Regions:
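Structural preference for solvent-exposed beta-strand-turn elements
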Residues: 179, 328-523
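Short beta-strand
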Residues: 35, 197, 272-276, 300-302, ...
């Protein structure tokens, strides 16, 4: 057996090292690693279709024409369904375009630095790659560009297509939602050699679904359709993507404002950062900035010409800004970032009080993850919490440190505690169980916790740890917390308690006028 030879000097796509690899390389723990390298949102998109229904059909192949998805993409893009070709992410469609327009004896053009997959797809088809577009069979255009973030006006791209009618001009618009909607899609009629690629991995937050789509003139789309795989997108992914395109729920305005804040901070200390129209910031530098950041557990995408920093939550962006010597301006909103490492635990926590209940918790203790997810969801907080502890001993240190960190995060996010409702209370029935919770956010740390459990453990969690952990939460948050819960099922007793606390916190942190609400005049 002999594989087909690759061009001399061929280089495959290389991912950045995993968090585990970074941690091992620099004597850290994986929980200490923050990633700024994937150009995806810090929180996932929210599926708008019943997942249970989709998963119940895992034994079936997807509907081969992807009609529902193509119609949704067409409506979102302002074209006809016959102009849409779908694929497993824009990467799959890049390969499809190369398969359609390139081959031995053909040539593609690009303008580096840009997305490396254009080079790889070109060479895998046995074609040549050059910078000069004259005589090219395919011209790759990343717009906005990755990794520099720069934007070419759609009219200029259309002029390029008209100047090279023999070439397919493939415009990768993976980040167009961050560029104020600047797109070449309306120009397909006047420049039929244009092909526009898009993805749901960026603004939509569905990178793991691997869904992308191409827009082209009907005859060009037909050529692409002939060369795509029979069923490149999983059925559940296609249904989630179609629903998201029909009713987009992302909001890039906050990302754009944060992008400008981060760039301004870097410009303020002398870094060379061009204007960017994406969800990342490009820093031109020949210094080993990426290596220095990685030593601190901060992973950016490294290039010969500089580094690319993906935007995360504002408080997390401040971490990388300070590591680069920049003094960030005040972050928008009410957020917090907590990182803590001891000989017993390592954890990091990102909290946004003005979120929508998007939660990712991974502590290594399944039932604790479940309870914290309930608390954050019912409080309408966005929470990401990753922790690793000495679970080989027992779960005590992890449970206590996680709740303490959550309290620290709440205190940090509340700041001066001005303009909040201050008080919150809730009663939650959970089948036979019933819980009540009351919260006072003024700086009077106190806790009264009464959880009536009938056994020692649920789901690998020692229930006796929960009262003390909630006390630590109250002390670190510097607030008063009362929680009572009782019932016949210990699982329900615990769930009701954390749901009630979440509901009470939701009320207490809500905007409630100016100052701190207190008849004493000062709190």
């Amino acid at each position: 057996m002999k594989a087909r030879a690759l061009p001399d000097g061929f280089a495959a796509y290389v991912w950045a090292p995993s968090s585990a690899e970074v941690a091992e390389r620099h004597g850290l723990r994986p929980e200490q690693v923050l990633r700024y390298d994937q150009n995806t949102p810090p929180v996932p998109g929210v599926p708008q279709v019943p997942l249970a229904e989709s998963f119940a059909r895992l034994n079936e192949y997807p509907e081969g024409t992807y009609r529902e998805l193509r119609e949704a993409a067409a409506a979102y893009s302002g074209v006809e369904p016959e102009q849409v070709v779908v694929g497993a992410g824009a990467d799959d469609l890049i390969a499809t375009c190369a398969r359609t327009f390139l081959g031995p004896g053909r040539r593609a053009a690009w303008n580096p630095p840009t997305y490396a997959l254009y080079r790889i797809a070109t060479h895998l088809e046995g074609a040549e790659l050059a910078v000069e577009p004259d005589g090219a069979d395919l011209i790759w255009v990343c717009n906005p560009n990755n990794p520099t973030g720069e934007l070419v006006a759609p009219e200029e791209v259309a002029a390029l297509a008209r100047a090279h009618p023999q070439a397919a001009v493939v415009v990768d618009e993976a980040y167009f939602e961050y560029a104020g909607g600047a797109t070449c899609a309306p120009l397909l009629a006047e420049a039929p050699n244009l092909v526009v690629l898009r993805t749901l991995s960026k603004a939509f937050g569905f990178a793991s679904l691997r869904v992308g789509y191409a827009l082209a003139a009907p005859e060009v789309a037909a050529h692409l359709e002939l060369r795509r795989a029979p069923a490149p997108i999983a059925g559940p992914a296609a249904r989630i993507a179609a629903a998201a395109l029909r009713e987009p729920r992302f909001d890039v305005a906050g990302d754009v404002a944060e992008r400008d804040r981060v760039r301004d901070a870097l410009l303020g200390v002398g870094y060379d950062c061009p204007a960017t129209f994406t969800n990342f910031v490009w820093v031109r530098s020949d210094e080993p900035l990426g290596e220095r950041l990685e030593e601190q557990g901060l992973v950016v995408r490294r290039f010969a010409e500089g580094i690319r920093i993906t935007l995360r939550r504002p408080t997390e962006n401040d971490v990388v800004l300070r590591a680069l010597g920049a003094e960030p301006g005040p972050p928008p909103g009410r957020g917090a970032y907590v990182a803590r490492t001891t000989t017993e635990t390592a954890l990091r926590l990102s909290l946004d009080l003005d979120g929508s209940g998007r939660v990712r918790v991974a502590t290594g203790i399944g039932f604790l993850d479940h309870l914290l997810t309930l608390l954050a969801f019912h409080a309408a907080f966005d929470l990401e919490l990753v922790a690793g502890g000495d679970l080989d001993v027992d779960e005590h240190h992890t449970v206590e440190d996680v709740l303490a960190a959550l309290g620290d995060g709440l205190a940090q996010a509340l700041g001066a505690r001005e303009g909040v409702a201050r008080y919150g209370s809730a009663t939650v029935p959970m089948d036979e169980a019933r819980a009540t919770a009351a919260v006072d956010l003024v700086r009077r740390p106190h806790a009264e916790i009464a959880l009536a459990f009938g056994s020692d453990r649920v789901g690998g969690l020692a229930l006796t740890l929960l009262p003390h952990a909630l006390e630590r939460f109250a002390m670190q948050a510097c607030c008063t917390v009362h929680v009572e819960s009782a019932g016949r099922d210990d699982h329900h007793v615990a769930e009701a308690a954390f749901k009630a606390l979440g509901q009470a916190l939701r009320q207490a942190v809500a905007p409630g006028g100016a100052g701190v609400r207190s008849t004493k005049g000062e709190a």
